[in-house]
């Protein structure tokens, strides 16, 4: 890699093992991109808790990188200008010759990144991302020649490809899906035993994010109360462990249950930390496999959870890329 290579990190790329960290980079620029905070062209009134999660997790990531010895620059969001273009223009003026980034997993962000770097004559290298288990090439190879595009078919392909819950070439237990066993109502005798989500003592960084969002996004939806989401790699790992230890075994039975006054029941609530990169699907699957093996977790819980990660999540990403449709970052 060139000495003047710069790694750019977006809000959904906070990977502990970011592939760009292995490169010979001059510095790292973390960008509060407008597509995640508020964009002029794609106007969205993002919930304050989403904005808080991005701000706090990105600030924590910057501190973590500095602790690793990297030179880190943090670019805040601007409501009036194209922050990404401004960052790239500055890098160009500093004689940065090459920009390194992970796959963005967002059509519009990818389009802008490529257009801006081309306009500024900046070399751009896109690295594979650990955000998903499948590569685009694997999904395309599977998709080619298929007359129909159903999640159930894709899920079987995934189970076989990843050798998960398989007995030879057949599904473990004799069924590909235990969805019919995931629709029980929560009995009254369990109402008082629904596990509570673990909580964290909020850090100074997280409190700064509360004040910053309230000050700069006061008219946005929501309130910054009862904040539950992890904002560091270690907290995300504890969040996963809490699910596996306290909710995993009954997840299958009550996966589709709805109970007034209960927001979480036995769900993992891993989507936010997965979607910003604080934890990866590979880590989640590895930990779930070990927990299931060591503790004889019911197969309807194991299969139901695995299906969400390797099935639905990967299928929706493949569908998004295949259709080339724009949706706002989640």
For every predicted segment, state its role.
Residues 326-330:
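Conserved small/polar residues in nucleotide/adenosyl-binding loops
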Residues 15-17, 36-38, 81-82, 107-109, ...:
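Flexible loop/turn segments at secondary-structure boundaries
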Residues 74-82:
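Short beta->alpha junction loops
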Residues 2-73:
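N-terminal beta-strand-loop-alpha-helix module at the start
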Residues 83-229:
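Beta-rich, aromatic/charged-enriched effector core domains that present basic-aromatic interfaces
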Residues 162-305:
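Glycine/tryptophan-enriched, flexible segments
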């Amino acid at each position: 890699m060139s000495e003047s290579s710069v790694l750019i990190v977006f809000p959904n790329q906070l990977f502990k093992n970011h592939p760009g960290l292995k490169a010979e980079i001059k510095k790292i620029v973390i960008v509060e991109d407008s597509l995640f905070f508020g964009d002029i062209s794609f106007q969205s009134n993002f919930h304050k808790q989403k904005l808080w999660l991005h701000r706090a997790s990105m600030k924590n990531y910057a501190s973590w990188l500095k602790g690793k010895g990297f030179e880190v620059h943090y670019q805040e969001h601007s409501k009036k200008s194209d922050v990404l273009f401004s960052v790239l223009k500055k890098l160009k003026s500093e004689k940065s010759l090459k920009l390194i980034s992970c796959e963005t997993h967002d059509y519009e962000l990818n389009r802008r990144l490529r257009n801006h770097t081309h306009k500024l004559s900046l070399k751009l290298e896109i690295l594979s991302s650990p955000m998903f288990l499948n590569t685009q090439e694997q999904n395309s190879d599977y998709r080619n020649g298929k007359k129909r595009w159903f999640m159930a078919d894709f899920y079987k392909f995934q189970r076989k490809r990843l050798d998960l819950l398989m007995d030879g070439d057949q599904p473990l237990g004799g069924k590909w899906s235990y969805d019919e066993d995931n629709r029980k109502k929560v009995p009254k005798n369990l109402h008082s035993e629904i596990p509570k989500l673990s909580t964290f003592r909020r850090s100074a960084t997280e409190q700064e994010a509360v004040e910053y969002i309230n000050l700069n996004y006061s008219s946005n939806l929501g309130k910054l109360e009862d904040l539950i989401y992890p904002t560091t790699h270690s907290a995300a790992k504890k969040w996963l462990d809490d699910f596996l230890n306290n909710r995993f075994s009954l997840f299958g039975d009550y996966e589709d249950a709805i109970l007034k006054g209960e927001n979480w029941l036995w769900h993992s609530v891993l989507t936010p930390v997965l979607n910003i990169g604080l934890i990866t699907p590979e880590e989640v699957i590895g930990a779930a496999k070990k927990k299931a093996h060591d503790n004889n977790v019911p197969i309807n819980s194991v299969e139901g959870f695995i299906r969400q990660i390797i099935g639905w999540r990967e299928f929706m990403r493949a569908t998004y890329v295949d259709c080339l449709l724009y949706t706002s970052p989640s």
